[in-house]
Amino acid sequence: MAWICLVVFVVSAIPTSASQWQINPQQLSRLREALRKLDGRYDPKEQMLREPFHSPGYHTTLKGGFVHSTRSSLEYAVGLLDTGDDSLLPRAEAILKRVISLQDKNPESKTYGIWPWFLEEPLEKMSPPDWNWADFCGTLLLQVALDHRDRLSPKVAKMVDESIQHAARSIQRRNVGPDYTNIAIMGSYVTLVAAELYGLKDIGAYARERWRQFYLHATSRGAFTEYNSPTYTVVALREVGRILKHVKDAQARQQAEAVYRLAWEEIAHHFHPPTRQWAGPHSRSYSTMVGPSFWSLLYQATDGRVNFGHNEPRLDEVRLPLPCPPDLEHYFTELTNPRQLLKTFVPGQPPVVGTTYLHPLYALGSVNRGDLWNQRRPLVAYWGSSNSVSSVRLRCLHDGYDLAAAQFFSVQRDGAVLAAVNWATDGGDRHVSLDRIKNATFRAKDIRLRFEFEGVYGRKKFREPNALDEPVEINVDGGLNIFLSTPYARWGNETGHWESGSDGARSWLDVVLYSGPEREINLKELEEAAAGCAVLFATGNQRFEKVDSKTENAHLSLKWCGMELSIPIKPAPITVQQK
C-alpha cells in the first residue's frame, strides 16, 4: 500500500519555481558549435543519439556495433533546449519522451527509478544494471525542469516531473554512503533540488542529512575517498557546482562551498605544469593522460588565464562555469623547484596515503596500498614537455585485461618508489565488486605484470632484460634516466621472466608470471604468488642501486634506497593482505 501512495504522490506533485534561463550571443555560438558535433548522430527513427559501442568492461553484455545511449541523448536534449531555439524544441521533446519511456517506474521493481545504458540492452539484460543512472539521468532531467519546463508541452512536462521524482525515490532507496564520492554528491544534488522543486518534505529531510554527512566525511579528511581522480574529481566538482547554483537551502550551500574548494585544491595540488598532466596516484581513471577537454576546462575556469591553447566548447559550459579559486591558479602554470605532496586519503589502520613528487623534469605518484583494478593508477609517472609527454604505469593482466585481485603496496621517497604485489583470494577479476573471483578460482592462460608506456615512449620499442633482476635503464633527453627493476616475481612454481612488446600506440615491458594452456587456477593452492619492483627517476649522477629482496616467514621483504617493504607471499583474503 505504501508503494501505491508513492505512485499517487509522484503523479500529483508540481514544480514550485519558474525558469530564469538566459544565454548571450557569444555563449549561444559556442553552444551551437558543441551541438554540431552531435547533430549528425541523431537518429530520427529511434529519437536518440547513435554512437559506437564503448564500455568500461562491466554492467553491459554488449560487445560492439552501434548503440543509442540514454545519458548521451539526455545531454543532447538539454543542449538543444539551452539554445532557446523553438525550432529545436520538437527534437528535444522527442528525445525526452523516448528516454523517459525506458525508465523503470514500478516501485516494486528492484531496478525502480533507473535506466539502461543503451536502448539495445534493457535493464533485465544488463550484467548487472547500473543504479547510478538514476543519479546521472535525474541530474540531466532536472536541468530541463529548472530552466525549460515552461517551454515544454504539458504532456512532456508532466513526464519530466514524474521521472525526476522516480529517480529521487530510487536514490533515496539505494542510499549511497559518502565513500562513493561522485554518486554521493550527485545523488545529494538530485534529492536536494527535487525536494525543493516539488515540495517533497521527506526527500528534503533525507537529502539535507545525506549532504551533511558527506560534507563532514570529506572536510574532516581533507580528501575524497575516490581520491585524486581525473574522471570523478571533475564529476564531483561539476555536481557541487550544480548544488551551489540550484539549491536554496543556506546550510547546504555553505557546506557545498567548502567541498567545492576541496575539489579544486585536489586538482591544483596534483597538477604538473611542465607536462600539463594530472599527476598520480589516481583512485579511478579511464585514461592515463588528460588532454584538450581538461585543458579547456582550466581555460574556462580561469577566464583564459591558464591557457594551454585549448578552449573547446562544452555543452554545459553556460550553465556550469566552475570558476577556479584565484589563489590556486599558479599551481597550473608554475613549478620551478621540486615539490612533494603527502596526502592521507583514507584514515585508518593502516591508512591510505598518496605520495606525489613533482619535479621540473617529471612527476611520480604512488599510493601506499590499493589494488590494480582497471581504473586504478596506484603507480604512475609522466615526463617530457607539454607537446611530447610520456607516461608509464604498472598493471596486472589476466588474459590481457586488468586483474583487480592484484593487491598493491608501496613506499616512495622523492623520485624513487619501492613496490610489491600479491593476490587476494576474494578479490575481483575484471571489477573490484561486480565480478569477484568465486572460491578463489578462475581460469587463465596468461598472468603478467606490465610496465605500460604511452605518449612519445608508447611508440618506442624496448629490449627486455636477460635476467629478472636486471634493471631496465631508459635514457631521456635533459639529464633524466628512468630505471625499472623487478628483483622478485613468483607464481606458484614459476619464476617471472621479462618480455617486451608494442601495438603502435603503447609499448610495454612485462614480467610474465604464467603463459601457457588455459587452466584452472586456485589461488588458495599457491604457496607463493608475489612480486617486488622498484622505479627510479634519476637526475644528475644518480645511479640505480640493487634491491635487496628475501623471503622468510611467508613474507617477501624488500630494502632499497633507505626504504623497506614487506608483504605476505601466499594469496589470502583482502582483509589479510591489506592489514
Please report, for each region that a protein language model flagged, where it lies by residue.
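Carbohydrate-active enzyme catalytic cores, enriched for enzymes
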Residues: 247-366
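Generic detector of solvent-exposed, compositionally biased contiguous segments
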Residues: 29-57, 348-372, 376, 384-407, ...
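Extreme N-terminal leader/anchor segments
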Residues: 19-98
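Aromatic-lined, polymer-binding surfaces characteristic
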Residues: 65-247
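Extended repeat-based interaction scaffolds and adjacent low-complexity, acidic/S/T/P-biased segments
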Residues: 404-579
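Bacterial N-terminal signal peptides
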Residues: 2-13
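Catalytic and substrate-binding regions of extracellular carbohydrate-active enzymes
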Residues: 310-480, 489
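Signal peptide-directed secreted proteins
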Residues: 211-250, 254, 258-266, 527-579
